[in-house]
């Protein structure tokens, strides 16, 4: 009741529901540059589950700019760290670390905030339009291949991320919030480890059940849900 941005809504999910009457969409560009072999094989797998799978398009908007809202909200939530100087005690102090992100956010102008709120509204309309014709959207998690991770963080659409396979990668570098974008860390050189790679499923507002039903069917098809990285990974 104290959170004016939330809605009390029932959670509806029946594990026995079939997905054969559902429409699953995907953004073709998200499965091109930047997509992995696992991403592409997962798209192929979902086409074999009996549901209708269609290509869809998301309106062309500067979705990554929404990250600036995150900067401002985080800076406001942790303002006491910045004003007290306690942010200096945090271990990580690079450009992309949270302490410097809190500091940089204070240079966003009132005009910036108005424009970002307008962009957020356009994003809400764009994603709502997307889900008028589909029940679930499948796509890579990373922000490189597609915009859905960032876009739905500002619309509230539910997302399920499941293990889709494994790949051999060296340890990743630190995640970064510098340059006005989210970077989840790049794999470096050196010893490689067998690590899980996931795929994301998004659904319409208050329709988590459909997302979970598709996730269950996809997990069964991929048959990697029981596997774990080795202990030295």
Feature map (PLM): residue ranges:
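A short helix-breaking turn/cap at a secondary-structure junction
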Residues: 1-40, 220-233
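Acyltransferase
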Residues: 10, 33-59, 78-89, 113-134
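Short helix-loop capping/hinge segments that flank enzyme active sites or metal/cofactor-binding pockets
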Residues: 13-28, 68-125, 163-165, 171-199
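Short connector loops at secondary-structure junctions
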Residues: 51-69, 102
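Short glycine-rich anion-binding loops that position phosphate/pyrophosphate groups of nucleotides
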Residues: 143-144
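Short hydrophobic alpha-helices that are characteristic scaffold elements of the AMP-binding
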Residues: 152-154
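Short, well-ordered beta-strand elements
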Residues: 186-190, 195-207, 211-219, 224, ...
């Amino acid at each position: 009741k104290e959170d004016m941005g939330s809605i009390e809504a029932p959670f509806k999910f029946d594990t026995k529901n079939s997905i054969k009457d559902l429409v699953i969409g995907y953004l073709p560009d998200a499965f091109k540059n930047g997509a992995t072999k696992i991403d592409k094989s997962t798209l192929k797998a979902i086409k074999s589950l009996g549901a209708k799978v269609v290509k869809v398009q998301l309106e062309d908007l500067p979705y990554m700019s929404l990250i600036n809202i995150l900067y401002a909200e985080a800076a406001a939530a942790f303002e006491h760290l910045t004003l007290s100087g306690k942010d200096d005690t945090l271990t990580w102090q690079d450009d992309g670390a949270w302490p410097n992100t809190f500091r940089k956010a204070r240079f966003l102008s009132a005009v910036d905030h108005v424009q970002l709120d307008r962009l957020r509204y356009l994003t809400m309309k764009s994603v709502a339009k997307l889900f008028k014709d589909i029940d679930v959207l499948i796509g890579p998690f990373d922000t490189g291949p597609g915009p859905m991770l960032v876009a739905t963080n500002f619309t509230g659409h539910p997302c399920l991320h499941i293990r889709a396979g494994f790949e051999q990668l060296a340890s990743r570098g630190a995640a970064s919030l510098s340059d006005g974008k989210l970077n989840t860390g790049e794999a470096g050189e050196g010893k490689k480890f067998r690590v899980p790679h996931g795929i994301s499923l998004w659904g319409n507002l208050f329709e988590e059940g459909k997302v979970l039903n598709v996730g269950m069917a996809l997990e069964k098809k991929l048959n990697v849900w029981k596997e774990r990285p080795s202990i030295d990974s």
